[in-house]
Amino acid sequence: MNMIMKTLALSFLMAQVLVSCMIENPENKLFDISGDEPVANYQVIGKVTDVKGNPIAGIRVIADYSTGMPYLADTLYTDKEGRFSKFMSIPRVDKFVMSFTDIDGNANGGYFESKFIEVNPVRTEMASGHFGGSFIVSAEVELNKK
């Protein structure tokens, strides 16, 4: 009998916990975590040079595609030709905030100032159904020495 009471009490507590964990949004609809937001393909590409046009290797490029809430970004690094490239499939966004930072100090041509720019994706393929389309995010950046 004691075991039956413990089982019933535990079941009652579990039901209370599950009900209290429900998250609702302002429209009084249950929070949607099913991933129904269309996903788009983005090809982030570009080149970083100094003011004389020489490529700069080892520059950290952060492609921030946050749309308000959680900070969402990908980190890339320039190669010996100053180029960076990354393919990503993410929910549809209208802009990327790109940052370019010299993280290796005097190596690769000296100390360079950081730079921040906004880039609007350019559509290369139309959306269809659950597919949000394809886009290119391109940036050619010159960095000044410090």
Give the location of each predicted region.
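Short, acidic Ser/Thr/Gly-rich low-complexity loop/linker segments typical of extracellular
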Residues: 69-83
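Sec-dependent bacterial lipoprotein signal peptides
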Residues: 1-21
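Beta-strand-rich domain onsets/edges
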Residues: 22-43, 47-52, 145
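Structured interaction patches on ligand/partner-binding surfaces of diverse proteins
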Residues: 103-136
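Conserved "repeat-terminator" motif of extracellular CCP/Sushi domains
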Residues: 38, 132-146
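Short Pro-Gly-centered beta-turn/loop motif in secreted/extracellular proteins
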Residues: 85-97
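Short, ordered, surface-exposed loop/turn motifs in non-cytosolic proteins
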Residues: 44, 50-69, 90
